[in-house]
Amino acid sequence: IELSQKESKSTFVLGTDGKNWDKIVTPFGGIRLQPDEQDLKLEIKDGNNNLWTCHQPMMKGEDVFNFSVNVAPNIINEVIKISGIDKSDIEFFAIHQANKQIVETIAEKAEIPAEKTSSETFTKYANNSTNSVVTVICDQLKNKKVKNILLCTFGIGLSWAACTIDFSDVYNGGIDTYISNQKNINKKEQIDHWIKYFKGEE
């Protein structure tokens, strides 16, 4: 990273929809709903015989899909309009890799040329949550010189954001795989570690 006096313009659009907070949520945990011993034994089956326990997240898939493919194209077009950049001058659109179908539907609805975006990163790395847009950039733009790129993300909250950024002075070396030489520890060893850690013994 080098300090520069050069101005690099960025434009952001952000939004939230708190009334639909329960579409992607872990109901128990934190301060809102602290589970006790009885809650931890709770097991519920839905109409398809899927098992849910209180410490697991839940998602209303159809609602989240519809939210994603409707809000994302709108904010993509909105941030382009505010930025003053011509859409044809945006060289790459990095879209949150929720899944392949969502990414491709957003691209189609936002009329993004296929060569200017990708769902390939999802195929390689899956949905890695808050890292996914950065992963797309590192994966798809490795060692490439581009100026105008657009980032778009959406998800829990429900929330969404998009921005245009000047990428012309950014070095992108891609993704390196780091393999740790640390030995894998089993569940009991992990629990023992955290007990000792909490007690200040480690």
Regions found by a protein language model. Name each.
Residues 69-80, 91-202:
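Claisen-condensing/thiolase-fold acyl-transfer catalytic domains that form or cleave C-C bonds
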